[in-house]
Amino acid sequence: PLLFPLIGRLQDSQYTLDGRAWSISTHGFARDAQFQVSEQGPTALSFQLEDSEETRRVYPFSFVLTVTYTLTKAHRVENRSAVPMLYELGGHDGFRTPLEPGETMADYAVTISGVEELRPYGMDSRCMLTIGEARFPLEGGRIPLSPRAFGLDTIVLDLEGERRAALVDRSGRERVVVECPDFPYLGLWTADKPFDTGYFCIEPWSALPDAVFVG
């Protein structure tokens, strides 16, 4: 799914705009919306989502969101409102894990290029970001896919340098690579109950979710 116009949760599922409180669900509405095919070619496919009466009940802007899939993926957000439009955009792309018969998710880990020490944002039991960052002990430069590492929902990171993440197997071979030069944050997620779900999400984000210290 695609996260738009919100990434993560808001306190009380509300935001305030021009003195009015608006209610919107976790990750916004794009993940549940019906996109329309806008362009189709032999090697690419584009989908569009436009504002509607339903979206304007929770997000008072006129917009067009276009997503193009090839071997790469591109996003374009067009503001059709007469005022500046606030929005966030994030991926929620899941990749089959493990990739080979006989493997489990424990045979895989995530590496972040150019980062020697990971300091993910803290998160409370409601999956809201907390003040400051927590230090994450790396095992050989990797984040292991384990219930211990992902026991509290999502690992949220600042991306620096190459802004490149890879899913690697026990031999260190990169099996999935996600490059996101235009996204400053990264979310790493999989379901924790049960943990061995067969997929893992590497999610480029344009912004951070709401935090408990936001008043």
Task: State what each model feature region is.
Residues 1-21:
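Acidic-aromatic substrate-binding/catalytic surfaces of carbohydrate-active enzymes
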Residues 7, 30, 40, 53-62, ...:
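Hydrophobic small-molecule pocket/channel-lining residues, especially in calycin-type beta-barrels
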Residues 18-71:
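Extended, loop-rich substrate-binding clefts of extracytoplasmic carbohydrate-active enzymes
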Residues 22, 27, 32-39, 138-214:
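Acidic/His-leaning functional-site neighborhoods
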Residues 44-50, 73, 165-169, 202:
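Generic recognition of long tandem-repeat/solenoid scaffolds
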Residues 73-81:
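Asparagine-centered strand-capping/turn motif at beta-strand->loop junctions
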Residues 84-86, 94-181:
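Active-site/ligand-binding surface loops and adjacent short beta/alpha elements
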